């Protein structure tokens, strides 16, 4: 893990020197260390961290057709509108994370713009989002 962390931090450092806004995606299968890596990076950098687990489908969105899609358990539309677009615009915003205990949206979380933004979770690199990321870690 330490070697991977050092490789990623070198890439992030270079991006931070070259760009005003940096978006990093950490994707991979369940229990592969995505959240652990994001947390380690958050200890090193002043950054925002977003979790795809906060964007599961609400009950009314859970259809056979949706679940038949690759990654169909993720609310791509809400993540794109509520988080990705404001991030790319450098705007302050808020979003409501999905609460897995109640299957509802929780209270809004306010987000201030930061130069470095990390999105972690399975399907954060889904083709639906296009190519918004400066660095993709898998």
Feature locations, PLM:
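Hydrophobic positions on the alpha1 helix immediately C-terminal to the Walker A/P-loop
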Residues: 37
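Short beta-strand-centered segment that lines the nucleotide-binding/catalytic pocket of NTP-utilizing
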Residues: 45-60
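Active-site signature of alpha/beta-hydrolase-fold catalytic machinery across serine-
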Residues: 40
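Extreme N-terminal, non-catalytic leader segments
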Residues: 1-24
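Conserved nucleotide-sensing/catalytic segment adjacent to the nucleotide-binding pocket
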Residues: 48, 61-106, 116
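P-loop (Walker A) phosphate-binding loop of NTP-binding proteins
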Residues: 29
């Amino acid at each position: 893990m330490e070697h991977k962390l050092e490789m990623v931090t070198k890439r992030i450092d270079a991006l931070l020197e070259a760009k005003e806004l940096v978006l990093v995606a950490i994707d991979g299968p369940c229990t592969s260390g995505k959240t652990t890596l994001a947390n380690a990076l958050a200890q090193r950098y002043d950054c925002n961290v977003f979790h795809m687990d906060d964007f599961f489908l609400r009950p009314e969105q859970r259809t056979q057709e949706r679940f038949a899609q690759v990654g169909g358990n993720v609310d791509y539309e809400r993540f794109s509108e509520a988080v990705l677009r404001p991030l790319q615009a450098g705007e302050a915003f808020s979003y409501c994370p999905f609460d897995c205990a109640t299957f509802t949206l929780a209270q809004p979380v306010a987000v201030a713009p930061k130069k470095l933004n990390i999105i972690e979770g399975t399907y954060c690199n889904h083709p639906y989002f296009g190519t918004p990321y400066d660095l993709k870690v898998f």
